[in-house]
């Protein structure tokens, strides 16, 4: 059985190395218009290279390229629309609608993909937070009930933590 990445490549999507497509829906019909860089994670989101809103009236759907750079994370429930470029080192927050180009080194959220900070600042902030918060080195699916109980208490007190 082919992986999601292999299926996308077979449909013409250009995909780099170290790409995770976690329940992501990639526009297979227009895969040749989509490029995904290296070190990209797309979680439970949709990437579209077409817009069929014109099809009934005009007999044609609008199409456009989608270019996703390197070192990009696209959060749960996001929608990437046609004719956009997402730069390098970008975090697209959960539920974001990307309908315009996103520059390098930013974090965007919301229905208008509002820039709320830089990728570098976000990573630095979390790197420092890891020194204060619980960090679990046991994969979530391998934790025992006792490990979950301990982690829950620590995460509740520290208002967050980190897991593999």
Which ranges hold each PLM region?
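Conserved switch/coupling elements of ABC/ABC-like ATPase nucleotide-binding domains
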Residues: 112-115
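Short-chain dehydrogenase/reductase
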Residues: 73, 91, 107-108
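Beta-rich strand-turn-strand
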Residues: 78-92, 96-100
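Domain-scale signature associated with acetyltransferase and cell-envelope carbohydrate enzymes
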Residues: 1-71, 78-80, 88, 104, ...
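Hydrophobic alpha-helical segments of small multi-pass membrane proteins
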Residues: 64, 94-97, 107
